[in-house]
């Protein structure tokens, strides 16, 4: 089946663009949604290009002045969307320039197309949307053109690298039966600090409401207690030592098969809004926006508002939108009123800032019970703040009448040690349930049970295959995760499969049959904020008697240790790569990771 419908070409004024173009259309099916036409360049793939403000889109470079044009057949109800950003040289000369941007529609070969958008402006950086109703030309063969030219007091000006046009998309009204995907993830969020999971404090009324409308997984874990490895596993359905991102700052391979890439290939709009992990590569997203407010609370608010703005644009096509909030990540400094909402009475000098917690640990100072309770209250305030933001997104989904057609998946990259192990307030490189357990809630009206709960073991590597299955799309054989809901329903019997985890490709863990086993074959002592984080060669915990994992009973159960060691060895041989090539981390990313406590000397 050919996806090439018609040739296209570029018409240039005073410049030559080395690209042709093509209309590419996917076949329609009940789960595919409306046919989308993407106007792709033929000479090489479009690039993921930024606007200088941390938002990236799949885009085409064009000189100034220039006109890009494509012959297309306009579908009924056709709607054009593209975005324009000016390159840095034009922005630098903005005060002396006046630019004109036009979108035109006309008969193929016509010299003067009808102008449907005509804007005059100074060059600026942030992407600006260009939307046009093409329905007046329904079922007609037309030529769509995108033009830009700039002039100063000296006349017309030229630049070889002038603007970026996001790959234009023409959509038509949504068909019934299409499943959108809204993925909400929160950094450093413990499942057991959500009231939906039985926490006595009412930290999460909005997340609780989502659980009442959906299915809650009580035994969900991350494959690694670090953000970049965990979220890469979520999107690739591979364990960290299989995809290669074994530590923060390591980049996802460009050829990785990702959830976003697979949905984008089936003409989903794909966008991501990130408070954390902003500098990581995320193949498959047509739009990638990193918040830049400068504070965790500000970044979260900015990312949330941008995500809601994007939802308002997603009325006519299937979408995959990912929002990742940093909220509960140390330091624990939620805005009012959440900053003090759960702090118990009684003074404590501990403020919950990351650098302060690091200094306390470096000094070997033990905190009092009051100090720990105070810090936990600050952490819970962060949970309350993030819950408020999640509520705003869910409210927008309902107000836009998208709730009934959208699969909502809520989870976290990892949890947080709250002084349970090694006198530690952080997560990486913890191998314990405090940092490995994550919330997992899925809601899809009419498909998933409302108010349901399950003890079915689940890992972040299972999310991509489960999401694809619920949208009716095939699951790649390369995925290592499982479809948690085959046919949209829980398996008749609870799956007792083990949940595996690792840290830095050197320490391994498994949760199986009510036990947690940690295997450190190299006697490796990982570093952590404030000092070393010692982990014994073998650790075994009976979760039924010791849910907080405080007593290592490996010496009392040698046969259990032997069996679980064999389980981990088989998993490593089957699913993990023996050698992960080291990767260089650029200075900007390194500094950002250091500020978050991910890099420590």
Regions found by a protein language model. Name each.
Residues 7-18:
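Bacterial N-terminal signal peptides
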Residues 21-94, 100-105, 109-601:
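Catalytic domains that recognize anionic headgroups
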Residues 1-6:
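Positively charged n-region of N-terminal signal peptides that target proteins for export
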């Amino acid at each position: 089946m050919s996806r090439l419908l018609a040739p296209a070409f570029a018409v240039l004024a005073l410049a030559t663009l080395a690209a042709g173009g093509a209309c590419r259309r996917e076949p329609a099916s009940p789960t595919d949604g409306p046919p989308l036409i993407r106007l792709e360049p033929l000479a090489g793939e479009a690039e993921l290009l930024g606007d200088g403000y941390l938002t990236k889109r799949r885009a085409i470079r064009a000189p100034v002045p220039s006109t890009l044009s494509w012959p297309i057949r306009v579908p009924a109800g056709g709607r054009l969307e593209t975005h324009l950003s000016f390159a840095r040289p034009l922005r630098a000369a903005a005060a002396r320039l006046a630019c004109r941007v036009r979108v035109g529609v006309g008969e193929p070969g016509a010299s003067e197309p009808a102008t449907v958008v005509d804007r005059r402006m100074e060059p600026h950086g942030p992407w600006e949307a260009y939307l046009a109703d093409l329905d007046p030309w329904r079922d007609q063969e037309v030529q769509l053109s995108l033009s830009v030219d700039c002039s100063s007091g000296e006349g017309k000006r030229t630049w070889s690298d002038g603007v970026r046009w996001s790959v234009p998309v023409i959509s038509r009204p949504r068909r019934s039966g299409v499943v959108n995907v809204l993925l909400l993830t929160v950094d450093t969020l413990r499942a057991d600090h959500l009231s939906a999971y039985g926490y006595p404090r009412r930290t999460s009324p909005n997340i609780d409401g989502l659980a009442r409308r959906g299915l809650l997984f009580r035994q969900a874990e991350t494959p690694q207690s670090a953000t970049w490895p965990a979220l890469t596993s979520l999107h690739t359905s591979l364990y960290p030592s299989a995809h290669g991102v074994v530590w923060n700052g390591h980049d996802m391979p460009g050829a990785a098969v990702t959830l976003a890439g697979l949905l984008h290939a089936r003409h989903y709009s794909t966008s991501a809004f990130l408070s954390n992990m902003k500098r990581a590569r995320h193949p498959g997203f047509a739009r990638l926006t990193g918040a830049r407010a400068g504070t965790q609370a500000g970044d979260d608010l900015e990312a949330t508002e941008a995500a809601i703005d994007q939802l308002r644009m997603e009325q006519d096509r299937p979408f995959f939108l990912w929002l990742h909030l940093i909220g509960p990540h140390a330091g624990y400094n939620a805005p009012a009123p959440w900053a003090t909402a759960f702090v118990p009475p009684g003074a404590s000098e501990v403020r919950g800032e990351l650098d302060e917690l690091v200094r306390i640990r470096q000094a070997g100072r033990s905190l009092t019970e009051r100090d720990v309770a105070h810090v936990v209250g600050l952490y819970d305030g962060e949970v309350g703040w993030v819950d408020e933001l999640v509520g705003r997104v869910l409210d927008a989904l309902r107000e836009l009448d998208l709730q009934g057609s959208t699969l909502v998946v809520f989870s976290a990259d990892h949890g947080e040690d709250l002084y349970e192990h090694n006198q530690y307030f952080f997560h990486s490189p913890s191998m314990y349930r405090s940092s490995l357990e994550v919330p997992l809630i899925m809601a899809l009206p009419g498909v998933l049970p409302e108010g349901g709960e399950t003890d079915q073991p689940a890992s972040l590597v299972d999310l991509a295959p489960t999401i694809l299955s619920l949208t009716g799309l095939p699951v790649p054989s390369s995925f290592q995760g499982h479809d948690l809901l085959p046919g949209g329903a829980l398996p008749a019997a609870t799956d007792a499969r083990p949940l595996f985890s690792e840290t830095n490709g050197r320490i391994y863990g498994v949760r199986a049959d009510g036990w947690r086993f940690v295997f450190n074959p190299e006697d490796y002592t990982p570093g952590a904020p404030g000092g070393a984080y010692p982990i014994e060669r073998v650790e075994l915990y009976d979760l039924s008697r010791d849910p907080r994992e405080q007593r290592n009973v490996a010496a009392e159960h040698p046969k259990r240790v032997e069996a679980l060691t064999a389980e981990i060895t088989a998993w490593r041989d089957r699913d993990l790569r023996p050698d992960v090539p080291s990767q260089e981390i650029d200075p900007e990313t390194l500094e950002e990771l250091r500020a978050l406590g991910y890099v420590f000397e």
